[in-house]
């Protein structure tokens, strides 16, 4: 899998005491060319669907579970996009996000946000794939976490767009 980006807010830090979190994320395209973005009210930014890989899960299983929970959608994973490593020194966290290109197979239910996500004001919004990068970049500089998420998801989306244009001749459907 191709490394897309390394995000580090401080140089020359000893990371041996940092927690490592693995996550799976998707650019999931619906038949009408829209993708789900999650708006986070607390911080006023957008992010791609996906989340942490739980004990005993593989990356693909975690991604399908997270996309169903956060977007209410069943997905078909088409291929990997790449990975992003974030070094969040304020939180003593190294997060590695594995990103995939997917098709939305069907919309199964409403999102089932966690208590934390509800408290943070998560809201699902469908956005045209071509417009999604603008949504990500227009937001997200209002808190520490958002700065990482916007950089991460923008890199993932940029590579997904490149893959769709070159490998899929601009169309997944």
Task: Locate the predicted segments by residue.
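Short connector loops at helix/strand junctions that flank enzyme active sites
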Residues: 19-21, 43, 48, 95-97, ...
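Active-site beta-strand termini and strand-to-loop segments that position acidic
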Residues: 28-31, 102-104
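Acidic, metal-coordinating catalytic segment for phosphate/diphosphate chemistry
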Residues: 1-25, 31
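Unchanged
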Residues: 53-76, 86-140
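Conserved beta-strand and immediately adjacent loop positions that scaffold enzyme active sites
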Residues: 25, 34, 123
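Nudix hydrolase/Nudix homology domain
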Residues: 44-45, 109, 116-173
